[in-house]
Amino acid sequence: MEDAQNLDLVSLSKQSKDLGSRSRGNGNPLSNEELTKGTFSTSNLGMFGTHAFTAIIVPPQSGIIALGEVKKEPKVVDNKVEIRDIMYATLSADHRVGDGAEGAVFMKEFSQLLEKPSRLLL
């Protein structure tokens, strides 16, 4: 997806659905240019019931985030056990582009956005 930082949430959703559908062989297949000009990818094996996994970077991309399934798990919140929806996400990054601390900051922000998705609308 090109210039994702300039798209609103509705446009991001539409383009994401289109690219995902085309990557699975529905409609016009993705071109070689679309497959190779990216800088960052998302891999969602959670929809197949995969709990957690490590995705492999496809050059020349700088990183890929792997998303696992959402499962209900016990979580301690304010010293009480609550059942919460939990999803594991892992980041694979090319350390020639950035160091691990930058990846950790990215993952923290990503987690905070998922915990409070209304922040995506700001």
Where are these regions (language model features)?
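C-terminal catalytic/motor cores of large multi-domain enzyme assemblies
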Residues: M1-L122
